[in-house]
Amino acid sequence: MGMCSRQERIQKDIDVVIQKSRAEKDCLFADFRYSDSTFTFTYVGGPRSVSYSVHVSEDYPDNTYVSSSENDEDVLVTTEPIPVIFHRIATELRKTNDINCCLSIKSKLQKENGEESRQNSTVEEDSEGDNDSEEFYYGGQVNYDGELHKHPQLEADLSAVREIYGPHAVSLREYGAIDDVDIDLHIDVSFLDEEIAVAWEVIRTEPIIVRLHCSLTQYLNGPVPTVDVFQISTKERFGLGHQLKKIMQTFVTQQWKQSKEKSNCLHNKKLSEKKVKSPLHLFSTLRRSPSYPPPGCGKSKSKLKSEQDGISKTHKLLRRTCSSTVKTDDVCVTKSHRTFGRSLSSDPRAEQAMTAIKSHKLLNRPCPAAVKSEECLTLKSHRLLTRSCSGDPRCEHNTNLKPHKLLSRSYSSNLRMEELYGLKNHKLLSKSYSSAPKSSKTELFKEPNAEGRRLSLTSGLIGILTPSSSSSSQLAPNGAKCIPVRDRGFLVQTIEFAEQRIPVLNEYCVVCDEPHVFQNGPMLRPTVCERELCVFAFQTLGVMNEAADEIATGAQVVDLLVSMCRSALESPRKVVIFEPYPSVVDPNDPQMLAFNPRKKNYDRVMKALDSITSIREMTQAPYLEIKKQMDKQDPLAHPLLQWVISSNRSHIVKLPVNRQLKFMHTPHQFLLLSSPPAKESNFRAAKKLFGSTFAFHGSHIENWHSILRNGLVVASNTRLQLHGAMYGSGIYLSPMSSISFGYSGMNKKQKVSAKDEPASSSKSSNTSQSQKKGQQSQFLQSRNLKCIALCEVITSSDLHKHGEIWVVPNTDHVCTRFFFVYEDGQVGDANINTQEGGIHKEILRVIGNQTATG
């Protein structure tokens, strides 16, 4: 053990003793000091004070010397850590009031060391107090029989996890000295497609670990555990972990409160009584000290306390938007489930609503709801900030309730089946093309049986995840938040809940966990909603990825995002199409928004955008220097750049040359995915039934700022509509590139000139383009940009073909795949037909197995 780690270990052990001694009301010791490798403390509970000294060596805890001021010649040599030594002294003093008790400990330890080796030693105790000292400390230094005091319910829950998910689905790290255990639940995420996993910054071949820090001997009867979420290989930058950690902490906190009932196990009862009698019982009832975390999980005291409460300082402010946690009383439970929560059988309305459910742990199970359109509550701005019905399914429909009253009222014990479901958008979420979600009726589902939960994650995703169309997209969030029945123990329930939430994380705000509101369903990349408190938390608490990281890994994509933002701002239709408007915290006043969707100032946004250094220059100089230059020119330039990057909800990757479509004749080719796992899996299921093909979608470059953040929408008969809707409402596609080029703003003269009339100016332009090599050619050189997307479309009866113009009314049947950008009037071949065999084959080659088309 190195010197640095040795000192840290000693200091941690001393902190454990000091912290918990001070927390005990009748502590017998005071004057704790540590200097020159000696830890001293004074006994003040007797007729006279006695000082004890613990001298540590370089190979601590080996060769540790213990003595007292009453008998400093007789020294104890031990291999025990400081907390164990202290606990045994305190126990002996309480029992015997003998200030020389150190000697009795010495004799016992010497006898023990003479009989057995250190690794296999078990201290032969004559009293319950000394048995407690073994239980007090266990970190690998003592071969403590952990099975002896491990809570029986914990053993049962661990066995259930291993039986259902396999022996590698859970692992333990026990810390018996402080009555703590780390339970690592391994959540399989291999069901994610590779490109989706990359978009979420998740390693799909490696499980996500949900770590619970809880009491080893008390388990469900102990303090609420803290939660960590991480992947071993991505601990440093695991953005998805921030969101999932908040979700799982809230879930665990709520379920812990529901389950805090004493076990009937006699062993647990005796153990609890013994802990109360222990002189330093606080040592075994508190969780591990914040100064003694497992490797890689260090936390300050303040952070640990915040997590124990299940809510951060900023998140407390978000409580006014209504907690997203679903109480046990609010969840889908079977009539027979009475052990871990109140049975719903007392409410006849609940019994009547019980129906069957599809058997799979990844089903987006809707919470019980019987929604009537006339019961939908219209929320005004600043009332409830678009509170989802998943926050509390039993909310009564009282329009006179003010937010604080609504959030603090005690709910009736009877399950109320009428649901608040239809919500009008809050001002902060209002978008020009957005409409209130339609109210719909959902069924009350039962929990799938255990056999159903054995199915693989991949099979569960195909065809059964709730569609994310405008009329039914609201069902998925409620199903994902529905609490699984605890029929196989708390740990299995926790895994099931994590498996429910992970595929639909993109549908919820990363801060408040309320569902996003979009007209045509959720997008791919998780991000923050537009509620002001969430924006503040997202931009100031380190949840948002740094622009420097994004530029380092995808500079060409950032360059494209900035160009799209500029095109939307310069458009005469910016009032309609520049959505979402930026929400940016003022760097000089973190309590204010410099760019506020409720107070739009397009000129100020353009000024900040003009001050952003070109992305190409950012890649050629130290990023911090570039940032300083931008801050001097305009303090809002860099925050705006951060927003442009973080608000993008689509996954865009610059295609390498070997994966580009040669017939598109542009170096600016991108993989563009905007469909979340649920939509991709539904798309895949539909493809198996009906097949699919490819078609182009043309739209002006100015529209793509919004499309990347809100998806392809049916603009027909809305103010977003730019062209006529001759063939009805839907997304317009074409297998012919020439038609889609027209929709993108390229006129026919440009296309003919580029292909059939090589004028001198065109020749010089082509020559100039061909001479650009290396990094220069990777970035956009012009602000005169045109673009076209290549989409995959389901060939079902819903696809209406009118010659070379196709109309798809169902947005779930269209998934973007590629995006092509052209500069200065340059275009690709205007006569490309995706239905030609060679073209279709080339598209499939480039896509490969990276998306749901595989």
Swiss-Prot record:
Known catalytic reactions: L-cysteinyl-[protein] + NAD(+) = S-(ADP-D-ribosyl)-L-cysteinyl-[protein] + nicotinamide + H(+)
Transmembrane segments: none
EC code(s) of this entry: 2.4.2.-
Gene Ontology MF terms: kinase binding; NAD+ poly-ADP-ribosyltransferase activity; NAD+-protein mono-ADP-ribosyltransferase activity; NAD+-protein-cysteine ADP-ribosyltransferase activity; nucleotidyltransferase activity; protein serine/threonine kinase activator activity
A UniProt-annotated Pfam family: PARP
CDD domains xref list: ADP_ribosyl
Sequence ranges of Acidic residues compositional bias: 123-135
Region of interest (Disordered), residue spans: 113-138, 291-310, 750-777
Biological processes per GO annotation: endoplasmic reticulum unfolded protein response; protein auto-ADP-ribosylation
Record PTM text: Auto-mono-ADP-ribosylated.
Protein keywords: ADP-ribosylation, Glycosyltransferase, NAD, Nucleotidyltransferase, Transferase
Enzyme kind, highest EC tier: transferase
Record field: compositional bias (Low complexity): 760-777
GO cellular component: endoplasmic reticulum tubular network; nuclear envelope
Domain PARP catalytic residue range list: 617-844
Residues recorded as bearing ADP-ribosylcysteine in the entry: 332, 367, 376, 395
PROSITE patterns, per database record: PARP_CATALYTIC (PS51059)
Similarity annotation: Belongs to the ARTD/PARP family.
UniProt function note: Mono-ADP-ribosyltransferase that mediates mono-ADP-ribosylation of target proteins.
Official protein name in the record: Protein mono-ADP-ribosyltransferase PARP8
Organism: Homo sapiens (Human)
Gene name of the record: PARP8
